[in-house]
Amino acid sequence: MSFLATLKEPGTSVCLKNEPAQSPSLHDHAPSTAAISREYIANLFDMPFMDLLLKAQGVHRQHFTANAVQISTLLSIKTGNCPEDCGYCSQSGHHRDTTGLQAEKRLEIDKVIAAAKRAKASGSSRFCMGAAWKHPSAKDMPYVAELIKEVKALGLETCMTLGMLTAEQSEQLAEAGLDYYNHNLDTSRRYYDEVVSTRSYDERLQTINHVRKSGINVCSGSIVGMGESREDRIDWVLELASMPLPPESIPVNLLVPIQGTPLGDKVLSEGQLPVLEWIRTIAVTRICCPSSYVRLSAGRESLSDAEQALAFMAGANSFFYGDKLLTTGNASQSNDDRMMQMLGLIPEAPKPKLTVIDALSGHQSQL
């Protein structure tokens, strides 16, 4: 069997010689989520790097079109002065004296729509909108609902990240037609208190549960390289894979250390995580959450073409387009276009939810 045939037939029973009996087989199909244990995830992390990437790419091709990537654009619709104290974030009001970030009010709706039109013209299929809030207020909800409707009218998928949500707010976003809601876990439960103190881990899980129950697709990921251990990365993957339904979209961020933030200063002082460990995390995420989109998010700006190519080989199939992610830099659009052409990557078309209205009851539902 040739190497290429092995890639196309990841279910083959061929195994590596001398492979530990407890380890995941190189060519196994992705396990059911019920079969994923902490030991299984730890063994994935311990696999030889090339074997892990080969396995992850095989799993990826079982569930997604090879070389197709979903492209998103992210816009900050309200910047800075956030009451949360996330140790990595320049938008926190707790760090404004050391980061120098200038807070901005909510963007006018017409400016957001203009940005969405530019995103669509550039090739993005999803438009993501983020606000530096602990949670949206009642007066914010009509504003965000209008944004969702206007962006969907352009034929784009919609995503929002607005902080914590109540069950009622989740329902309001669903009624407006929101496709995805982002609420990252950031790290493991064990390391979480080193990252933020103003929002608990369980509160994050509660918001994700509200979003899931409302019928909105869940987007939830991590930030790798904040000083956490591999054990924390194992626990984070297990948390997602153990959910009744893992997130449809999983961003795996590589920390961009921002001077003036507690975690940024810590990493700049102690040294950054090797990029290959971030790529390992992507591969393990792909294997354990095989039906989820795995997105390259923050941290790409500093990566070489080869490092990003390895990330796509590891099973990533989504990334953010545009020169800026909220307040941090991103790889330039022209550079991404060049890289996609070089790697043979193909943009995926948008698949926004459709609103169906029952002719008798008038009830609206999403397809």
UniProtKB/Swiss-Prot annotation:
Gene3D superfamilies: Aldolase class I (3.20.20.70). This is Biotin synthase. [4Fe-4S] cluster binds at residues 82, 86, 89. Its cofactor is [4Fe-4S] cluster; [2Fe-2S] cluster. Belongs to the radical SAM superfamily. Biotin synthase family. Transmembrane segments: none annotated. Keywords: 2Fe-2S, 4Fe-4S, Biotin biosynthesis, Iron, Iron-sulfur, Metal-binding, S-adenosyl-L-methionine, Transferase. It comes from Psychrobacter sp. (strain PRwf-1). Binds 1 [4Fe-4S] cluster. The cluster is coordinated with 3 cysteines and an exchangeable S-adenosyl-L-methionine. Binds 1 [2Fe-2S] cluster. The cluster is coordinated with 3 cysteines and 1 arginine.
